[in-house]
């Protein structure tokens, strides 16, 4: 069984930061696999990143000098693929093209059986009322392809509920119980479920999301990853003994926790 982790560019870049934690904290298990076509993304070229603690580079066996906007890393030991998307789409209107032309062929090429999508949302932007437990921070929704009849019926949207749907089955402790057509996850699911040549090996889709605000979300992303691992969302994902940042975070993310320094300000 192989799984692809796909982070969405969303609030606070939490999914991307969580991928950074995952890769750099277990750098001995991950390696650079390939760069995907980034024609629908904002252009990006940067230096090759590496773990801050001096561990082996993720690019150690790759003959390259620069990193690009859309790269795939592979954990052969655990059958895991992880995409790191470093820039957003040029326009949200290209999301459908991105899924159909870039992601679906990748799923087929490597016979991916499960895709795990990571996302982050603003709690205050819930026009369609999908957030039903705002006291919770995380959500986990799942879709399985076991029943083709159920799949076909799920593609039909009730006219009275056209702004939301229940394609995903959320856990009882999730902050949301449906998805909105305004969410990128809706378009992603729609394109995968309606694909004329759906990847044959694909058996399940999992959607992990968290509520957040913009800022230095390095701690939020670490806790998000910890939650994903604790829930065994990705069955083969091992616990992280020591969290390691990438060197690219220096001066940008991951400042020491300064919350205690503001105590006197509010007393």
From Swiss-Prot:
Keywords: Chaperone, Cytoplasm
Keyword NAD: no
Localization (cell): Cytoplasm
One CC-aspect GO term: nucleus
Source taxon at top rank: Eukaryota
One Gene Ontology biological process: proteasome assembly
UniProt keyword Ion transport, yes or no: no
Family matches, as Pfam families: PAC2
PANTHER family linked to this entry: PROTEASOME ASSEMBLY CHAPERONE 2
Family according to the record: Belongs to the PSMG2 family.
Reported function: Involved in 20S proteasome assembly. Required for maximal proteasome activity. Affects the chymotrypsin-like activity of the proteasome. Can be degraded by the proteasome. Involved in the endoplasmic reticulum-associated degradation (ERAD).
Subunit note: Component of the 20S proteasome chaperone. Forms a heterodimer with PBA1 that binds to proteasome precursors.
Other facts: Present with 2940 molecules/cell in log phase SD medium.
Protein name: Proteasome assembly chaperone 2
Gene transcribed to yield this protein: ADD66
């Amino acid at each position: 069984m192989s799984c692809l982790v796909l982070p969405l560019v969303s609030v606070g870049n939490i999914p991307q930061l969580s991928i950074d934690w995952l890769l750099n904290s277990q750098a001995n298990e991950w390696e650079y696999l390939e760069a995907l076509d980034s024609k629908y993304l904002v252009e990006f070229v940067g230096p090759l990143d590496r773990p801050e603690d001096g561990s082996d580079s993720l690019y150690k066996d790759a003959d390259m000098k620069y990193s690009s906007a859309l790269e795939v890393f592979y954990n052969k030991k655990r059958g895991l693929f992880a995409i790191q998307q470093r820039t957003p789409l040029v326009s949200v209107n290209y999301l459908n093209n991105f899924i159909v032309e870039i992601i679906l062929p990748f799923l087929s090429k490597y016979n991916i059986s499960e895709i795990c999508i990571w996302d982050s949302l603003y709690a205050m932007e819930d026009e369609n009322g999908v957030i039903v437990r705002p006291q919770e921070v995380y959500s986990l929704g799942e879709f399985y392809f076991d029943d083709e009849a159920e799949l076909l019926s799920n593609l039909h949207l009730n006219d009275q509920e056209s702004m939301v749907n229940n394609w995903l089955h959320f856990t009882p402790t999730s902050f949301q119980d449906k998805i909105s057509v305004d969410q990128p996850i809706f378009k992603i699911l729609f394109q995968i479920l309606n694909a004329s040549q759906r990847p044959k090996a694909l058996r399940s889709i999992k959607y992990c999301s968290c509520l957040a605000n913009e800022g230095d979300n390095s701690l939020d992303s670490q806790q998000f990853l910890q939650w994903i691992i604790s829930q065994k969302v990705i069955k083969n994902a091992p616990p992280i003994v020591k969290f390691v940042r990438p060197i690219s975070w220096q001066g940008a993310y991951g400042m020491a926790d300064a919350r205690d320094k503001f105590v006197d300000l509010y007393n």
